[in-house]
Amino acid sequence: FYYRIFHKNRVNAIGYRMHEEYADTFFKHAAEVIKQSENKSAARAYIYGFICHFALDSECHKYVEKMIQVSGITHSEIEMEFDRMMLVQKHIDPMTFHRANCIHPTIKNAAVIAEFYDGVSAKEIRKTLRYMILCDKLLTAQNPIKRKILFFGMKVAGQYEGVHGMVMSEQPNPACKKYCQILNGV
């Protein structure tokens, strides 16, 4: 998703395509990648994170889609409010938390990840990781001036509706409270 995000290309198309495919195809391939990997522990660490993301998407998205239909709140807003709820529970300030702090865009890490995706190089994966960090830094906006500039830029680019929910709102959206409680129970 994050590789040169403003342009459709073969690398970011993989993420979109994978959301439409059956997971067993990827997981069978992943098992082979891990067997053949020179760095099995790093490959397993990546796939464990992938499995967590997959499980969260698989279990929560059906609820999120229903919530969107009922409330009109966007997918990214619901996810952002769910992130807020979990961060607040851990006594972490959601306005300043950088979700990408755990990403280390080394060529070594990128090479491990690239093994899972046919036709994608370690350099492309490293760029993707760097874009993820950049987007996180850009969208983490405690400063009201930065927020106004961000939202203005989104509107000018015609991306406001789809992207504004990725910026943590200053205050919780009360309309999301019950949805977050439902997701927390999933």
Where are these regions (language model features)?
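N-terminal leader/auxiliary helical segments
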Residues: 1-186
